[in-house]
């Protein structure tokens, strides 16, 4: 509701959930958990974005569900992974994918504050990564007969999306210092405002070949 406000259609739900059957369950109640367990027993894939404490509370750990269905593909998408000091933090597109992976910092002009990003970009990119893991697990199941657990996180996919700059930092290349020393970005890769107040995005990294 925060995203679509008073609009008569929940267009976010329509984008990601069209043509899907749905059911609402209260997992805080034993009856709700029982229904979900019945569904899991005959499912191919179970996808969730719960933290470890929630999985324990709702009786949805990998070992528990695998005991009900040995062929189940258990897929999880978290904010900051399942191990490490941030694993129990709530993760959102803005905080984990955009901010923690350094993408927000790269997009801000000069020393100004980062702009608040649009929502859903990192969510969708990370979902495709999880989809790839699920498909590989299904392929493996055809050979082994057994399910498996696959996982990814928003921060991991943000790091991959920002991989060129992070790899540069690991190698000792400081893009910010280079831009500060030059005082400008490349004129061949820049956004220019036109006389009629529109904008042209120019990307010509190799002028000799253009």
Describe these PLM feature segments.
Residues 12-14, 150, 190:
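Residue-level detector of beta-strand structural context in well-folded domains
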Residues 1-146, 178:
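N-terminal helix-loop segment corresponding to the beta1-alpha1 unit
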Residues 118-125, 152-154, 202-203:
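Short beta-strand->loop
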Residues 172-210:
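Alpha-helical interface/anchor segments and their boundary "cap" residues
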Residues 26, 48, 152, 201-205:
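Active-site-adjacent beta-strand anchor residues
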Residues 79-81, 154-160, 196-198, 204-209:
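Glycine-rich beta-alpha junction loops
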Residues 138-178:
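Substrate-binding/catalytic subdomain of NAD(P)-dependent oxidoreductase enzymes
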Residues 25-27, 154, 194:
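Hydrophobic residues in beta-strands and at strand termini
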């Amino acid at each position: 509701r925060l995203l679509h406000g008073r609009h008569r259609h929940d267009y976010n739900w329509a984008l990601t959930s069209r043509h899907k059957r749905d059911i609402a369950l209260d997992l805080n109640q034993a009856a709700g958990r029982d229904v979900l367990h019945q569904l899991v027993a005959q499912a191919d894939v179970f996808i969730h974005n719960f933290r470890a404490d929630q999985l324990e509370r709702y009786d949805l750990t990998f070992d528990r569900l695998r005991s009900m269905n040995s062929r189940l593909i258990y897929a999880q998408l978290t904010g900051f992974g399942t191990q490490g000091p941030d694993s129990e933090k709530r993760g959102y597109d803005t905080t984990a994918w955009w901010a923690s992976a350094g993408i927000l910092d790269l997009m801000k002009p000069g020393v100004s504050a980062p702009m608040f990003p649009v929502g859903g970009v990192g969510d969708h990119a990370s979902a495709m990564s999880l989809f790839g893991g699920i498909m590989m697990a299904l392929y493996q199941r055809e050979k082994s007969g057994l399910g498996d657990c696959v996982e990814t996180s928003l921060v991991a996919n943000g790091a991959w999306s920002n991989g060129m700059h992070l790899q540069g930092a690991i190698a000792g290349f400081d893009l910010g210092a280079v831009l500060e020393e030059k005082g400008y970005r490349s004129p061949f890769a820049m956004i220019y405002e036109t006389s009629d107040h529109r904008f042209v995005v120019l990307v010509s990294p190799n002028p000799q070949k253009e």
